């Protein structure tokens, strides 16, 4: 028998501890290696150790991606506003009238026209954003600057007709809502709608207002828009249980039913009510305050003290407006703002505007279709039916939504009229005088109609106004497509100092002829002037967008030809 002494036991323990230390060191060494794993097997269950550096990298990547998404979302929130303002043009009282008529005569089959109109509206509004962002001009000022005088005045005539037709719909719709809700006579209702004129006349001053005030103004309009959406979300809960959801969704697919009961004429009315001409001027103008705010904050655009001294005879408001109208965005501002402006507008139109228009038609189609009241149905009729067949609250909520739409649309239409007159004509008047004269041009026909015609003619006047809007639409879309396709207009300049160039670029620049422009993949060029490079970046439409724009214009024009022929054959009877 061998006796193991204390020294031998100590040696055995030391050897065991050393072995454990070696294993631990190997484990930690393997942990530090990227994407390495180690498995230790013993009496205990198998344990796996994954590289800690890999875990940290994955965690850092996740955190960085999450931070990027937060930054993108925070930046997007800064651009919310113009899309809501433009969306008002697509949920005005004219939409109520045409959608009610479509639902009563064709039930849900014309939902596909609303969807198509929404896509066309988004496409055209993106062109408006592009024009306003690159040139710093709204559509009316671009017409005055780049078109012959006679053509500019012709387009001004069509634009003013569009504003007047829109005002007629807004005023009549608001007057009807006030008449039903609080029993206000129609002429008095028209007079009440003039209040929003003074609200705009004395508050909305794009050149003299800060970006913060403009955002507050946008929030005011946004509250009205959200109120309309809430009303129709509640309204849909009141529709008959027998309404087939499958049949509703089938309406988004073209069918033969859409041609029944003069459906093409109704479709043209929907197109005119959805793709509003005055929204083209509005969309191209609303993008500019954020561009200007970016350039002012980054020191890219200022008015010198010398200029202020020269202009001291002018009022502060006139100086600020002149600064605003002379502004041209820098390339940095365009890159920062344009994409987010397009995304914000597209999301708003494809959610809020599409939902409201479809909801109006679904409510009308589920309550009026195949009913004795369907023939000649108007806003009064649908209120009576909703109140009698569904619930009194249903009719009240519908009229409340109409009132909110009329008020918000009246505000936006006043802004559009101001943009049109100041852009096309460039009146040499005080700003408040221009706004008052602009509104008087539009409000007088509304007063005449509200006083002289009865309830039976109101629906026809509303639908006719939407057909007028559809007819003038191609004339106002044409210059928008022309401007955004022309490289000499859709361009911006970037100035680069030679001293900041490296030797290789400096040598290449010396080989260029002074004053020459060199094309770079058709999108940019370089011009040398006073020892500095002026890089020209072209942002005109590519051939795909150009083809789509031409197809849209031809489609609108063909529909207008059909509408004019139908009016001629029916001797002006649009019933």
From Swiss-Prot:
Pfam families xrefs: Nramp (PF01566)
GO CC list: fungal-type vacuole; plasma membrane
Gene Ontology BP annotations: cadmium ion transport; copper ion transport; intracellular copper ion homeostasis; intracellular manganese ion homeostasis; iron ion transmembrane transport; iron ion transport; manganese ion transport
Residues in cross-link Glycyl lysine isopeptide (Lys-Gly) (interchain with G-Cter in ubiquitin): 33-34
Deleted gene: phenotype: Decreased manganese uptake.
Protein localization: Cell membrane
Residues the record lists as Phosphoserine modifications: 24
A single MF term (Gene Ontology): inorganic cation transmembrane transporter activity
UniProt induction comment: Up-regulated under metal starvation conditions (at protein level). Down-regulated after addition of manganese to the medium (at protein level).
InterPro entries assigned: NRAMP_fam (IPR001046)
Bridged cysteine pairs (disulfide): none
Catalyses which reaction(s): Mn(2+)(in) = Mn(2+)(out)
Main location: membrane
Source species, domain of life: Eukaryota
Organism: Saccharomyces cerevisiae (strain ATCC 204508 / S288c) (Baker's yeast)
UniProt keywords, alphabetically: Cell membrane, Isopeptide bond, Manganese, Membrane, Metal-binding, Phosphoprotein, Transmembrane, Transmembrane helix, Transport, Ubl conjugation
Function according to Swiss-Prot or TrEMBL: High-affinity manganese transporter involved in manganese uptake from the extracellular environment. Also contributes to cellular accumulation of other divalent metal ions such as cadmium, cobalt, copper, iron and nickel.
Protein name per its UniProtKB record: Manganese transporter SMF1
Residue segments, region Disordered: 498-517
Record topological domains on the Cytoplasmic side: 92-108, 178-179, 240-266, 366-396, 485-543
PANTHER family the UniProt entry points to: MANGANESE TRANSPORTER SMF1, SOLUTE CARRIER PROTEIN FAMILY 11 MEMBER
